[in-house]
């Protein structure tokens, strides 16, 4: 059994290892620790420092690493596990992997719907910040004698952010305080203390008209409106289009997120506006939405992002071309083959290889991986 190729995946912490051997049982397995009953090559891989789990299906492995581990260190060890190290280990003159590449996951800790702490997780660190004391005090007031605080607290996913983690924390804190103003806390406490609401997170979903939104002068109110907006429809596009011109980055970013929920090619021109936003966080979010929608019609716009000054944006463009591209994108890919970011360069190489080999994109397989039982 040999490695045919190694490909990146939508997750910076997962690599796909394509093998020369295809499983005949058509089953899949997830391995997380070395055990005698497992295949020897699986145990060898799990013994590599930094590897946390392996998903094996058909003719490939999905290898997960710790966020703090570097692929540039791990990949040669993976290759060496399959064949003689002297033959497999290659002289790699790639730039060092930037540990701040990719997403910063933002989460909000709540108790009965009352927020009181923010957590950010990047590739190499975790940062937490408590909300102002008023929020902690109100959270305490919402407790009853029968509450199990550890069991009842919940982490709310605020989505991904991009950039310097300290600057991201400042931005997320500003967003949270705008979304949950102090004036709203008594309402949250009242709801938390009501019978049958002990474990429920309270959400204020409210639809507003374009005129009502346009009349809002305070950006915090505009952001709160978008954060509490129900799933948008085509009728909401004018409002969201207006939000794309907002002076505040969080408002523009949330408008992009909402536009991405309208699963239609008709919203592509609005997402293209996001691709040209002055904020790299908005550009990357727009690229993520386009990637999730998967419309090949967006290829010309995504190709332009290969020249973006931010590698997090270039990586998303290369990943989309890997998933949806064809021979028309080869000249652009080859023109950017020497990208100075390791992850971007690797993704461009894989896109070129897939297109030239005539291989199909494996979106259905990524869904299988995402839904696998771990």
Swiss-Prot record:
InterPro entries: ARM-like (IPR011989), ARM-type_fold (IPR016024), Nfu/NifU_N (IPR014824), Nfu/NifU_N_sf (IPR036498), PBS_lyase_HEAT (IPR004155), Virulence_F_dom (IPR025989). It holds the Pfam family Virulence_fact. It comes from the Bacteria. GO terms for molecular function: oxidoreductase activity. The keyword Ribonucleoprotein does not apply. Keywords: Virulence. Belongs to the CvfC family. Required for hemolysin production. This is Conserved virulence factor C. The gene is cvfC.
């Amino acid at each position: 059994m040999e490695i045919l190729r190694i490909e990146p995946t939508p997750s910076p912490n997962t690599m796909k290892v394509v093998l020369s051997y295809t499983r005949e049982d058509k089953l899949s397995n997830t391995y997380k620790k070395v055990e005698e009953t497992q295949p020897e090559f699986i145990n060898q891989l799990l013994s590599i420092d930094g590897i946390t789990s392996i998903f094996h299906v058909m003719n490939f492995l999905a290898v997960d690493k710790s966020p703090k581990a570097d692929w540039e260190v791990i990949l040669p060890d993976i290759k060496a596990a399959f064949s003689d190290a002297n033959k497999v280990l290659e002289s790699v003159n790639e730039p060092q992997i930037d540990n701040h590449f990719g997403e910063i996951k933002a989460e909000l800790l709540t108790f009965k719907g009352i927020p009181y702490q923010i957590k950010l997780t990047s590739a190499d660190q975790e940062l937490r910040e408590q909300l102002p004391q008023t929020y902690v005090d109100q959270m305490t007031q919402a407790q009853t004698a029968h509450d199990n605080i550890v069991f009842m607290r919940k982490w709310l996913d605020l989505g991904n952010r991009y950039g310097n983690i300290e600057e991201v924390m400042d931005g997320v804190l500003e967003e949270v305080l705008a979304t949950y103003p102090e004036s709203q806390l008594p309402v949250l406490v009242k709801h938390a203390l009501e019978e049958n609401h002990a474990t429920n997170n309270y959400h204020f979903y409210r639809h507003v008209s374009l005129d009502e939104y346009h009349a809002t002068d305070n950006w915090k109110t505009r952001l709160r409106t978008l954060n509490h907006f129900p799933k948008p429809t085509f009728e909401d596009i004018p409002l969201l289009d207006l939000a794309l011109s907002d002076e505040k980055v969080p408002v523009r970013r949330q408008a992009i997120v909402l536009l991405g929920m309208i699963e239609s090619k008709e919203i592509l021109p609005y997402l293209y506006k996001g691709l040209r936003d002055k904020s790299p966080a908005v550009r990357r979010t727009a690229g993520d939405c386009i990637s999730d929608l998967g419309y090949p019609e967006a290829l010309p716009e995504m190709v332009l992002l290969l020249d973006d000054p931010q590698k997090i944006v270039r990586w998303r463009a290369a990943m989309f071309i890997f998933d949806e591209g064809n021979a028309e994108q080869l000249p652009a890919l080859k023109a950017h083959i020497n990208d100075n970011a390791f992850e971007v360069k690797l993704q461009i190489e894989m896109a070129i290889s897939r297109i030239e080999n005539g291989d199909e994109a494996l979106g259905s397989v990524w869904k299988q991986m995402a839904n696998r039982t771990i």
